[in-house]
Regions:
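Alpha-helical structural elements of signaling/regulatory helical domains
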Residues: 71-72, 95, 108
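Structural signal for the C-terminal ends of transmembrane alpha-helices
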Residues: 66-70, 140-146
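Interfacial segments of alpha-helical transmembrane regions
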Residues: 1-15, 63, 67-87
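Core segments of alpha-helical transmembrane spans in multipass integral membrane proteins
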Residues: 27, 41-65, 85-93, 122, ...
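Hydrophobic alpha-helical membrane-associated segments
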Residues: 14-21, 87-91, 95
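Interfacial loop at the N-terminal end of multi-pass membrane proteins
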Residues: 2-59, 100, 104-117
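Hydrophobic transmembrane alpha-helices
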Residues: 80-87, 132-142
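Alpha-helical transmembrane segments of multi-pass integral membrane proteins
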Residues: 106-136
């Protein structure tokens, strides 16, 4: 179980990194002009692969939740972590992914680009907060788990 706890912690922590970067960049990006925003968005080329980390974190947290189901408090905290990770996936596919599709991954700027920018930025910021809660909840679960 210790190895799985380690994997869950590492993957959940790594999943927080890109969303945290988006959260902290938001104040600097939200008011950029169309051309400057398009340039800034090019920074994220290839970041889609980081979705693998998020899915891995969710799977590791799922397995860990099953393993600690006999320990009420660690189970609840681990379940919260798992549900938070699943919520980030739901938010991504409900808000971020459609904005990426509408802008061809920010290589084209449609007429409603400002609304799409807001949708994209806020969905990432929201996910940063949710993954932080997942990370904290997982940490509490790990601290309270009996071997």
């Amino acid at each position: 179980m210790r190895f799985l706890q380690f994997v869950a912690m590492v993957l959940t922590g790594l999943a927080l990194v890109p969303f945290g970067a988006h959260l902290f960049a938001l104040p600097n990006k939200i008011h950029l002009s169309e051309s400057d925003y398009l340039i800034a968005q090019n920074i994220y080329r290839g970041w889609a692969l980081l979705g693998i980390v998020l899915i891995g974190a969710a799977l590791a947290n799922f397995a860990l939740t099953i393993l600690v189901r006999g320990q009420r408090v660690p189970f609840v905290f681990n379940l919260v972590s798992l549900l938070c990770l699943l919520a980030t996936l739901a938010i991504f596919f409900a808000f971020t992914f459609p904005a990426n599709q509408a802008t061809n991954n920010w290589t084209e700027m449609p007429a409603n680009w400002q609304q799409l920018r807001w949708q994209w930025e806020i969905s990432h910021a929201t996910n940063a907060v949710i993954i932080f809660v997942a990370f904290c909840s997982l940490t509490v679960s790990l601290l309270l788990t009996q071997e």
